Amino acid sequence: MQNNLKIENNKPIQTNFLGHNAVYHGYAGVNDDAGRVFNREQCELEADRAKDLGLKIARTIYNFWGYDKAKQSWTWNTPDFNAFCAWVQRMKDRGIDIALNTGWLNIGEIMSCSWRAPFPGTVKGNWQQSLQNFTWFVSETVHQLIEVRGLTNVKYLVIMTEPNNIGNAYEVSGVKNEVHSMQDGWYQTAEAVHNRLVQDGRRSLVKLVGPNSTLTGCFPEFYDYIKERNPDWLDVYTNHTYLDFLWPEVKTPVNGTHVFSAIYPGVRLQQDVALKPNTEYEFSYYIKLNVENPNVLSGYVLHGAFKTLNKDGNGRVFHSGGDDTTRLGRYTTEMVEAARLPDDWQQLKCTFKTEEDVQDAVVGVFFDVKGSQKYSVYATGFSLKEKGSNTELLQNGNLNGFEHWFRCPYMLRQTEEQNAYDFWVHAVEKALKHIPQGKDFWFDEYNILSHGGNGNLARLEEPCHGTDLAVARVAFMNSGIQSSLLWTLFDQQWPNNHGYSDSKDDFGFKDGVHKFGVAACPMRKNWTYPAYKAVRLTDRVGGGVGTKVYKGVGENNVYCTMSQAPNGKLTVLVVNNNSTEQPISLTFENKVAATLNRYLYNPATATGEPGIPALEQPEKIAVNGSITDVLPAGAVVAYTNMD
C-alpha cells in the first residue's frame, strides 16, 4: 500500500533553523592523569569528522582551566586552557560555532560542593560574594576567548546543566538562607551573569541559553519561575529528555487518565500535599503488572504517605528500599509483594491517619520490583481524599504529563507514546507550553538508549540506531524548534575519569570514555559506527540564519520534513521507520520543480568504517510536483540540491 506524504510548504514553521547540532566537548588535547591525551593527528581527525557531519554548533563543557593552581591566580595561560582554545580554533577553522557551558552544576558549581573541580572563587558560606566572583569568571572568559584571542565562534553561553537535578549540593551549600530553591539558585545565577556582561560591555557578544533542564523533576517550575520574573534577558530556552523504552498499547482503566510504567527497581513517584494533623485520609490508584512469569520476581510496591528528606543524592524525595523508610507515621504506608501485583487493572487503597507532625508530607509510590525478566508495573488514576470528603487533594492525578509530580526519573514514561516520533513531538510540546511566546527553543540533549537490548530500540553500534536518530530529527523539525543537540556527537575520553557504567548497557562510561556518539574515541579505536552515515545524511537539511523549515505530514511510520536555505535550495528528508520496505508518493502544497540528488541510508547495507567514510554518489531525480519512491526498511533518504 502506497504511503501518501505531503510537505506543507505554504508557510514555514521555523524561519531561522540553526540545524541539527550536538554536544561535543572540547577535551581533545587536555591533560589527563593517566596520559590519555590526543595527539595532533587525533585532534584533527575528530575535528574533521565534526565538519563532515555538518555540525554547526558544538555545545561543550568548560572547566576552570584559566586558573593556574601553582600560582594561585587566573593567568589564562595554562596548558589546559591553551589546549581548549586550540580546540575552539579548530572548530572556527571548520565553520562551527561554540555553545559554552559556563558552569555545569547549579549552586554546587559556585559553592564548590559538587563532583566538579572546586571553583577558585568560592567564599564558603557567602553566596553573594561567590556569585559575584563567578560572574567575573564568566565575563572574563568571554573577554579572553573572544576579545583577546579572536575566537568569535564562541556565540552562546549555556547557563548550567540540568539545574533541576542537582543532587544534594543545595543541602550542603551552606547558603539556603540566601537561595530559597533550585529555581531561585539558577535564576539568581543566570540573571547575575546577564547583568555582569551588560556592565562589562560584553552582552552583545554572546547569547544566553538555558535553563537546560530535564522533563523530569520540577518541570515545568523552572520555566514558570523565569516567566513570573523577567523572561526577556534569556535569549534561548532549552530542555531535554532521552528515549530509552517504548511500551505497547495499554488501555487505561479510567477515561481521561494516562498510564505510566516503571521498568526498574527504585522508581519513586510522589506529590507534595498539605495534610492536617490527626486526620484520616484515603490514598488510591490503579495498578497492573506485565511480566511473563511473576513467580521469579522479588521486591514490592510500597505506597502511602511519606516524609521527604533533603539529603538524597537525587533531590528532595522520600526514602525507602536500601535506606531507612521515611514514613509520615508508623501506619501511613502499605506494601504489596511483587508476585501479588494484579495481572489486570485493580484499584489499591491505603487508608491512613496522620499524627501531629505533617510537615514535608508527600503521598506516593515506591516501585521496587526486581527480577531477571523484563517487566512493567503500570499505574494511573491517583487520588487522595480526606475520609468522608469528595474533595480531591491531588493535582494532575490522571498523570497528564509530569506536572505536579516530583522525581519522575527517566525510566518512568507515558505509555501513550507508542512510537518514537510521537515521543519526541510530545516532549517538545510539553516544553513549548511553558516558555514565553516568541522565544527561540532548543532541544539541548537527546539520544535513543537501548538498555541491554530491550527489543524495540537499536543499540548505538547497530545500523538501525541511525534510523532512530533520523526519526527524532524529523520530529524536531516538524515541531518547529530552532535547533536540536545530540548527546553526544562522539564517544569521548573525559580527562581524569576512570569510571564504568552499568555493564549491560552499551552506552555510558567505559574506563572514562563516555560512549554515546556515532564514532569511537580515536585514542581507543579509529572507527565510525553505521549511524555516522545517517547523521551525516540528515544534516543535509542545512541550517543557519534564514533557513526555513516546512512541516511534513506522514503516515504508517513514514515521516517527512523539508528545509530551505535563503538561496532557495532545499532538502526533503524522509524516514521509513518500518521493518519492511514502503512505497511513497510525496506531494507539495506549493509545487516544487527541480533536479534533486537522492542520498540513501540503508541499515541493511550500512557498516562501520575507519577514518571518514566516503560520501556515496547520489542518484539524480527530476521532481515536478511530487516524489515517488520505494524506501527500504529503516531507510533514511534526503532529496536535495543543497551543496
Residue ranges: model-predicted function:
Residues M1-L45, L53, Q271, G364, ...:
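Mature N-terminal, pre-catalytic/accessory segment of carbohydrate-active enzymes
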Residues N3-N9, E41-E46, P79-A86, E140, ...:
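Alpha-helical scaffolding within the catalytic cores
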Residues A50-E249, T279, L289-S298, F306-K307, ...:
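Substrate-binding cleft and catalytic face of glycoside hydrolase catalytic domains
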Residues F245-K251, H404-N454:
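Glycoside hydrolase catalytic-domain groove-lining segments
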Residues W247-Q418, D422, N577, I612:
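Extracellular and organelle-lumenal recognition/adhesion modules and their flexible linkers in secreted
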Residues N447-Y559, P566:
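Aromatic/acidic polysaccharide-binding cleft in carbohydrate-active enzymes
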Residues V553-P603, G634-A638:
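Carbohydrate-binding surface patches
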Residues L615-D643:
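C-terminal beta-strand-rich structural cap/linker in extracellular carbohydrate-active enzymes
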